[in-house]
Amino acid sequence: MNTVRVTFLLVFVLAVSLGQADKDENRMEMQEKTEQGNSYLDFAENLLLQKLEELEAKLLEEDSEESRNSRQKRCIGEGVPCDENDPRCCSGLVCLKPTLHGIWYKSYYCYKK
């Protein structure tokens, strides 16, 4: 029975002493992996930033294309109310105050020149 105890004690001491060495090695491995992980995170962050910049450039390009292809604002036809400060009467028409007496919805209308 003493031999079993001595053998068990010997195995226990060896396991503890070797386990501590493994613990130091594990700590060093973890530090290396952490440093590698940080460089990986920096790489991933830069890659994501590049993709976002490309996407932003595409979106801005699409916006500029839409503004180039969009229609001009429609003009106002004859006899239609217009704004004195911002007349949008079609070519050949002028925004004037009506000559007839009466109650009008707006005080200016598009008339021929």
From Swiss-Prot:
Keywords: Disulfide bond, Ion channel impairing toxin, Knottin, Secreted, Signal, Toxin. Residues 1-21 form the signal peptide. Disulfide bonds join C75-C90, C82-C95, C89-C110. Residues 60-83 are annotated as: Disordered. GO terms for molecular function: sodium channel inhibitor activity; toxin activity. Probable ion channel inhibitor. This is U11-theraphotoxin-Hhn1a. It comes from Cyriopagopus hainanus.
